[in-house]
Design a protein with these regions (language model features):
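Active-site and channel-lining beta-strand-loop segments
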Residues: 1-43, 248
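Structural preference for alpha-helix termini/caps and helix-kink/transition segments
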Residues: 30, 37-270
Length: 270
């Protein structure tokens, strides 16, 4: 577990960043990584090795950032699993935005002249809400919850086929830019989205002993069934993949596979 019940001098654990010329400091409340009573330095070294052998560094960061600094909550394994899945969701959204930008790159030249931001309050509020959270005693928990609202809106916009593509592109470009500007200050979303997604998928494929050769074969058979309009067989194959821990998402852009467990309440990773 991560315990924050030890009083560590603030000069050892405060974190500072500068935003628009103002300095903000985060005090994790004596947060150390420790399974048993130990000194701050020993705990940090010991537990960092244990946690980072299981989880990406940004998962650890998100777990701490999501923990109220004034609270007495102790972070346990289930918190890391939840943060890993939330971070996966964030990176999936960022990757979907990048894919949409690539698919509509021909519209880029029109953005400056004809592009319109669909929800200015959401897009322009990203930086404003972040600064407000920092002014609220460096409330990183609030900042993360605001990120979640923006990502939910981004996914809704991506899935809205009735919205003007140029305005969607203009809006999503600005969301991507603003989110990275503030999130990078907290040390998250530093990876290339596609790289992070592949790393987490590979981890869960190994954890669940998923035979990807068999999965690929089933997906090809399903595609053939769909092409032949044999939808009953297509649904049967989809159900079989689900039993193997693979979910299939069909959209206007085709079919995409993902790891079922990443969208469920997870088990402990031992």
């Amino acid at each position: 577990m991560i315990s924050n019940n030890l009083n560590i001098p603030t000069h050892n654990n405060q974190k500072s960043i500068r935003i628009q010329g103002h300095e903000y400091k985060m005090y994790p409340g004596g947060t150390i990584i420790n399974f048993q009573d130990a000194s701050a330095s020993l705990g940090n070294i010991l537990e960092s090795e244990v946690v980072l052998s299981k989880y990406h560094l940004e998962v650890l960061k998100l777990s701490i950032l999501s923990n109220p600094p004034q609270g007495s909550k102790e972070l346990v394994e289930t918190d890391f699993i939840a943060s890993e899945k939330q971070l996966y969701y964030f990176y999936k959204t960022l990757n979907n935005i990048k894919n949409f930008e690539n698919e509509n790159s021909k519209l880029n030249e029109s953005i400056a002249i004809h592009g319109r931001i669909i929800k200015p309050d959401i897009v322009n509020g990203i930086k404003a809400s972040f600064v407000a959270a920092m002014n609220d005693n460096f409330n990183t928990t609030l900042a993360i919850s605001e990120f979640l609202k923006v990502f939910k809106y981004s996914n809704a916009l991506l899935n809205n086929a009735n919205e003007n593509p140029l305005h969607k592109l203009t809006t999503l470009n600005k969301i991507y830019e603003n989110i990275l500007t503030v999130a990078n200050l907290l040390g998250i979303f530093l990876e290339e989205p596609e790289d992070f997604i592949l790393e987490i998928k590979e981890k869960y494929i190994n954890l669940n002993h998923i035979d990807m050769e068999e999965v690929k074969e089933l997906m090809n058979l399903r595609q053939e069934a769909k092409s032949a309009k044999n939808y009953n067989l297509s649904d049967e194959i989809k159900a079989k993949l689900d039993q193997k821990g693979i979910i299939i998402r069909d959209s206007q852009f085709g079919s995409e596979w993902d790891i079922k467990e990443l969208f469920e309440k997870g088990r402990l990773i031992l």
